[in-house]
Amino acid sequence: MPVNLSMTPINKAKAWGVHAVTASGVILALLALLALVDNKPQACLLWLGLALLVDGLDGTLARKYEVKEMLPHFDGSVLDLVIDYLTYVFIPAIFIYRYIPLPEHFELLAVGVILVSSLFCFCNVNMKSTDNYFVGFPAAWNVVAVYFYVLDLHPWVNLATVLVLAALTLTRMKFLHPFRVRQFMPLNIAVTFVWLISSGLLIVQQPADLPILLGLWFAASAYFVGICLWRSAREWFG
């Protein structure tokens, strides 16, 4: 990629600043883990949600400030993957083990499936399509944990969901990356923020009967499911 910015100390400092934004995710991971230790599930999910937002934005900043070209000796993608495994997979897996009902004697199996299947996702060099959709379920167990917590599903439904999503990791099904997919990007980002805000409010107010907020949350969720199925169907059926 050609370098459009000059290699000045200020531009290099900006690039390091972007890496600092990415690195802040490990502090958020620590806060989420400490919330688990302190038996504060809502705080844990909120810290993970903030980490999700940081992860969604740092890539945009990295491209804007040409971080890879400014600092070729420091691989921000490795930094990102390390933090993502903590905030998308490892801590959510512990959260699910501790707070989400699973069938008796199947708890460790479910968590093990989450951890191992996610390793494939993180090591898959073909995890992105040419139009920046994720190929296969992108190990977004932080998002899954929110659904489990808010919906309070039956233990067997939770286990089946874990197994199905883990299996989808190995498929060619497309999953939206709202900050990278160019098509419908403004709408994708708007719906993402609707989902994030409504999720945060539902987490804070659990358990609560909030039909309007739940309706908004489900509508945003339905949009994501719909666009993923639409993009996958385009490939399946030409």
Swiss-Prot record:
The keyword Cell membrane applies. Keywords: Cell inner membrane, Cell membrane, Lipid biosynthesis, Lipid metabolism, Manganese, Membrane, Phospholipid biosynthesis, Phospholipid metabolism, Transferase, Transmembrane, Transmembrane helix. Its cofactor is Mn(2+). It is an enzyme of class 2 (transferase). GO terms for biological process: phospholipid biosynthetic process. Residues 1-16, 63-75, 126-132, 177-183, 231-238 are cytoplasmic. Its EC number is 2.7.8.24. The keyword Kinase does not apply. It is a multi-pass membrane protein. InterPro entries: CDP-OH_P_trans (IPR000462), CDP-OH_PTrfase_TM_dom (IPR043130), PcS (IPR026027). It catalyses: a CDP-1,2-diacyl-sn-glycerol + choline = a 1,2-diacyl-sn-glycero-3-phosphocholine + CMP + H(+). Its main location: membrane. It holds the Pfam family CDP-OH_P_transf. Signal peptide: none annotated. The chain crosses the membrane at residues 17-37, 42-62, 76-96, 105-125, 133-153, 156-176, 184-204, 210-230. GO terms for cellular component: plasma membrane. It is found in: Cell inner membrane. GO terms for molecular function: phosphatidylcholine synthase activity. Residues 38-41, 97-104, 154-155, 205-209 are periplasmic. Belongs to the CDP-alcohol phosphatidyltransferase class-I family. Condenses choline with CDP-diglyceride to produce phosphatidylcholine and CMP. This is Phosphatidylcholine synthase. The gene is pcs.
